[in-house]
Amino acid sequence: MRADREELDFLPPVGGMAVDVMEVELPATRRAFMLVLVQTAAVLAAIHGMHLMNELYLTSFDEKFQWKIEAWRLYLALYYVVCIGMTIFCLDGGHADEPSREASPDLGAAGAELEDESAQAGAVQGPETLRSQVLRART
């Protein structure tokens, strides 16, 4: 939307072909390492926040305490928690519950032709195809 709240309609490029946006997957080991790293940082931020709360609680019993709380410490602890929570949310992306996908077929020059012709997409298994499979299985 533009500033005047008029919706813009984006047309495909000049060639008439639209570009599909595909999701890029991180390798499982790198993703797991990043999640462990971020979750460790979240635990450290939570411990730091508890330390700040404990420090404020203990200083409240001090007679000289005049409600002069260093506000930047509270904001820093809140900032840690929010940033790390958002990072975990963005890295996880809701895909943790989904099973991992199978490896895609090799469509390069060598893998373009499958050895078993009946496994190709759109192949109809008629009597001739089934007979050739049975003969291959016997030999």
From Swiss-Prot:
<dbReference type="InterPro" id="IPR004292">
    <property type="entry name" value="L1-like"/>
</dbReference>
<dbReference type="Pfam" id="PF03052">
    <property type="entry name" value="Adeno_52K"/>
</dbReference>
<keyword id="KW-0238">DNA-binding</keyword>
<protein>
    <recommendedName>
        <fullName>Probable DNA-binding protein</fullName>
    </recommendedName>
</protein>
<dbReference type="GO" id="GO:0003677">
    <property type="term" value="F:DNA binding"/>
</dbReference>
<feature type="region of interest" description="Disordered">
    <location>
        <begin position="97"/>
        <end position="139"/>
    </location>
</feature>
